[in-house]
């Protein structure tokens, strides 16, 4: 009875606190009544309610090196005591180091082989905005009719107007009226021949194609290699700038440095974007381009006040130093195998698990039912997990998650799935 009373009082205190906080927030989020106060590794803590959670979300694929990583804390402390911000009116040494490191490590690990230059910004949507602007600039230098963009259904590229315009979900776009014009959405699951036919017909008015090698929010769907090769060859043939959005699927999440690493050169993009894990929670984004794109850019064509600041780049240097190591990437694959084995065992017991898919530690678990109850009941039992559509769980933990923690989280998930299956 005493414990029940403590839980009840904690719940009241949590509700009171979250209600007072919500009073000052714009109404664009639907958050549960918990208040996260600290984290360590793959654990998060709500000290208001005296709760501990296993984290399978990692800030939506952001904290790839875990929460409150001691080494990152040291980097932030040291750099913030040295130099935080200068603007892009001047060079800073951390940005210079990081740009070189990002380009060269991309090539070394089998990614974009003609990567040449980097534009730093503060988020994924900004990185995609830059990619769209750069590609339109490139196209208009050769033909004023090439203004269109090809994107794909179930895509997500960001919330600002440009990246939102190439995000397919109507619920995100329609409340804001007209978007950037000349955007066409194709179905990435269509046969290659159908995609090729449309692209060839519309190539004279198409500036760029943007896609996620693995669709994240759209349900964790991996684009087959042969399709990426075909699209890459087609874009090169018709002078269409190819953009890969690697914001969620990149930087080690698949057990490769980039999701397009080790693909044939024909499938490599002209531009790829990254953010999320790049700063392990510190706001940072980057747009990596080849010479074909860079050669048309001039001073003043684009810019940012904060992008590439010394503090962000110091963190980025540290993150990349740790992730761009083959043993680290191999360890991601090993942990993915632990997840896959556990989830396949779960699927055998509960047939309403329709499919398990993804790559590395970007995993989708599709059910025949809505997953909102699974998410809420898991949270009640100490596991944080998120969705990718109405009937798909998305598992995107820290890349450093321990195998014991994986198994503990899967035990919680199994208890919830078992309860829902029998109800």
Curated annotation (Swiss-Prot):
Residues with N6-(pyridoxal phosphate)lysine modification? 276
Keyword Coiled coil among record annotations: no
Q: Name one GO cellular component term.
A: mitochondrial matrix
Q: Tell me its cofactors.
A: pyridoxal 5'-phosphate
Q: GO MF terms on file? A: identical protein binding; N2-acetyl-L-ornithine:2-oxoglutarate 5-aminotransferase activity; pyridoxal phosphate binding
**What is the annotated localization of this protein?**
Mitochondrion matrix
What this protein catalyses is: N(2)-acetyl-L-ornithine + 2-oxoglutarate = N-acetyl-L-glutamate 5-semialdehyde + L-glutamate
The superkingdom listed in its UniProt entry is Eukaryota
Name its GO BP terms in alphabetical order: arginine biosynthetic process via ornithine; L-arginine biosynthetic process
Pathway given in the UniProt record: Amino-acid biosynthesis; L-arginine biosynthesis; N(2)-acetyl-L-ornithine from L-glutamate: step 4/4
Q: What is its EC number?
A: 2.6.1.11
Sorted keywords for this record are: Amino-acid biosynthesis, Aminotransferase, Arginine biosynthesis, Mitochondrion, Pyridoxal phosphate, Transferase, Transit peptide
Top enzyme category: transferase
Family in the record: Belongs to the class-III pyridoxal-phosphate-dependent aminotransferase family.
What PANTHER family does the record tag this protein with?
ACETYLORNITHINE AMINOTRANSFERASE, MITOCHONDRIAL, AMINOTRANSFERASE CLASS III
Q: What is this protein called?
A: Acetylornithine aminotransferase, mitochondrial
**Source organism per UniProt:** Eremothecium gossypii (strain ATCC 10895 / CBS 109.51 / FGSC 9923 / NRRL Y-1056) (Yeast)
């Amino acid at each position: 009875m005493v414990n029940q009373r403590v839980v009840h009082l904690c719940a009241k205190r949590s509700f009171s606190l979250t209600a007072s906080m919500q009073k000052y927030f714009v109404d664009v989020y639907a958050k549960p009544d918990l208040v996260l106060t600290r984290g360590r590794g793959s654990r998060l803590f709500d000290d208001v309610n005296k709760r501990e959670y296993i984290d399978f979300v990692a800030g939506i694929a952001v904290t790839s090196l875990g929460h409150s990583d001691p080494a990152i804390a040291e980097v932030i402390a040291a750099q913030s005591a040295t130099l935080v911000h200068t603007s892009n009116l001047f060079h800073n040494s951390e940005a210079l180091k990081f740009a070189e490191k990002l380009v060269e490590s991309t090539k070394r690990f089998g990614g974009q082989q003609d990567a040449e230059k980097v534009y730093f910004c503060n988020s994924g949507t900004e990185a995609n905005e830059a990619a769209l602007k750069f590609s339109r600039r490139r196209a208009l230098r050769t033909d004023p009719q090439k203004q269109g963009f090809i994107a794909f259904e179930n895509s997500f590229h960001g919330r600002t107007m440009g990246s939102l315009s190439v995000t397919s979900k109507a619920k995100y776009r329609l409340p804001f009226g007209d978007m950037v014009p000349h955007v066409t959405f194709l179905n990435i699951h269509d046969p290659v021949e159908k995609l090729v036919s449309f692209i060839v017909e519309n190539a004279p008015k198409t500036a760029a194609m943007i896609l996620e090698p693995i669709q994240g929010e759209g349900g964790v769907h991996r684009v087959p290699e042969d399709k990426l090769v075909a699209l890459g060859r087609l874009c090169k043939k018709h002078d269409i700038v190819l953009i890969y959005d690697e914001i969620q699927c990149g930087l080690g999440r698949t057990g490769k440095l980039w999701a397009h690493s080790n693909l044939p050169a024909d499938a490599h993009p002209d531009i790829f974007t990254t953010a999320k894990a790049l700063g392990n929670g510190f706001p940072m984004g980057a747009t990596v381009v080849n010479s074909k794109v860079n050669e048309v850019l001039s001073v003043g064509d684009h810019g940012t006040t904060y992008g590439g600041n010394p503090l962000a780049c110091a963190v980025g240097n540290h993150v990349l130093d740790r992730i761009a190591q083959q043993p680290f990437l191999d360890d991601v694959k090993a942990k993915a195998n632990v997840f896959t084995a556990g989830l396949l065992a779960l699927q055998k017991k509960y047939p309403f698990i329709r499919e398990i898919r993804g790559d590395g530690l970007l995993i989708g678990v599709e059910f025949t039912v809505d997953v909102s109850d699974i998410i809420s009941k898991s949270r009640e039992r100490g596991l944080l997990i998120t969705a990718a559509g109405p009937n798909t769980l998305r598992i995107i933990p820290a890349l450093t998650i321990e195998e014991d923690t994986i198994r503990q989280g899967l035990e919680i998930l199994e208890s919830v799935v078992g309860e829902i299956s029998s109800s």
